[in-house]
């Protein structure tokens, strides 16, 4: 696993069945001491975090990307140079206007949009937005 010795990964999911399945996979991989699960909504989990982070992978309710990112910023949870990786921003572009404006135009981030096809569907355009916190 590509984490520093003292590093860990925190996964947040509101669906208890998804968390249970993920825990089994992580246990099978022998990573149960490196991966921690929070079974709650994103805003509850963000408010519960005690330490800042270097990498954030966002892939949940698309209309919450922007508000959750602002919450993390306001709580000083994103380390300088931290990466925010937002998934599925192409197919849900209409819900991403505030998010895009913030990571592209606020000056707080250096951001890049990378186009791709939706998994398992070569005929559907999608994209990810990768942003570095300045």
Language-model features, listed with the residues they occupy:
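Conserved SAM-binding loop of SAM-dependent methyltransferases across substrates and taxa
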Residues: 1-5
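A general structural motif
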Residues: 6, 53, 79-81
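Short, conserved active-site loop motifs that form the nucleotide-linked donor/cofactor pocket
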Residues: 7, 34-36, 82, 109
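Short SAM/SAH-binding signature in class I
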Residues: 51-58, 83
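Switch II (G3) loop of P-loop NTPases
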Residues: 59-63
């Amino acid at each position: 696993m590509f984490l520093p010795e003292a590093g860990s990964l925190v996964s947040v999911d509101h669906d208890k069945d998804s968390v249970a399945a993920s825990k089994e996979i992580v246990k099978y991989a022998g990573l149960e001491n490196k991966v921690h699960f929070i079974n709650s909504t994103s805003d509850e989990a963000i408010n519960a975090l005690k330490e800042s982070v270097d990498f954030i992978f966002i892939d949940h309710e698309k209309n919450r990307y922007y508000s959750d990112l602002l919450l993390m910023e306001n709580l000083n949870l994103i380390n300088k140079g931290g990466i925010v990786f937002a998934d599925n921003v192409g197919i849900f572009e209409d819900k991403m206007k505030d998010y895009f404006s913030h990571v592209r135009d606020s000056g707080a981030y250096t951001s890049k949009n990378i186009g791709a096809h939706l998994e398992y569907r070569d005929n559907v355009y999608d994209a990810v937005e990768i942003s570095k916190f300045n």
